[in-house]
Amino acid sequence: MLAGVAATAQTKTVDHFTKVIVSPYIQATFVEGTEESVTIDNIKVDESKLHIEVNNQTLRIYLDGAKDYPKYEKDNSNGYEGSHPLYQNRSVVVTVTYRVLTDLSLRGEETHLCKSAITATTFTLKIYGESDVTFNELNAQELETTIYGEAELNLKAGTVKDQQYTCYGEGRINSESITGNTSRIIAYGDADLTLNVSDRIKITAYGDAKLHYKGDPEIVKGLHFGDMQIEKIN
């Protein structure tokens, strides 16, 4: 396929996986289905640069030279030394069809959507960079979320009994539309969280974290340095 030329979406069947790692410059939508696959909806680079691999039940989708983090290359075209991204944002758009999904790692600045309702005992989510991540519905006993950077996470429906959030940087989390019992927050930086739990929230903050919450949970303050703000909302 030629880079930048529109074509009919291609679907690749893959081995069984329960965990997905999506690398920078790739935008993904996740849907539940009966057969596990990756559909390439749009691609702006040479297809040979795209890798879709499954090892130890982990699906990895990445581009050459940008497997883990965004990469830059030197540019002297204007008479002075500079750099530009190795690829454009949204160089690849994919749809991932899963049967079981328990672990998700997203890297870069793309927008990602978990379109189908996800049900798991424990769901682990890691976000690196400035991604915008939305779950239409998540139901789990426990959610373990770690955000590195300025990413935004929105949970639109569901029930997660125990919610654990660790934020490094200025991440924004909105789980107001899901219900839960307890939450534990550790924030390094200026994270902003909006939660809806019934029993207990414990927050530890190193920086100017903000917590907005619905319901009447017990608020437990751990160590905190900086201007931590806590607000009850209707």
Language-model features, listed with the residues they occupy:
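Short beta-strands and strand-coil junctions in structured, solvent-facing domains, enriched
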Residues: 28, 112-113, 132-133, 152-153, ...
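Acidic (Asp/Glu) and glycine-rich low-complexity loops/linkers
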Residues: 10-126, 137-146, 156-163, 228-234
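Sec/Tat signal peptide C-region and signal peptidase I cleavage site
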Residues: 5-9
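Short, surface-exposed interaction patches in beta-rich subdomains
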Residues: 153-234
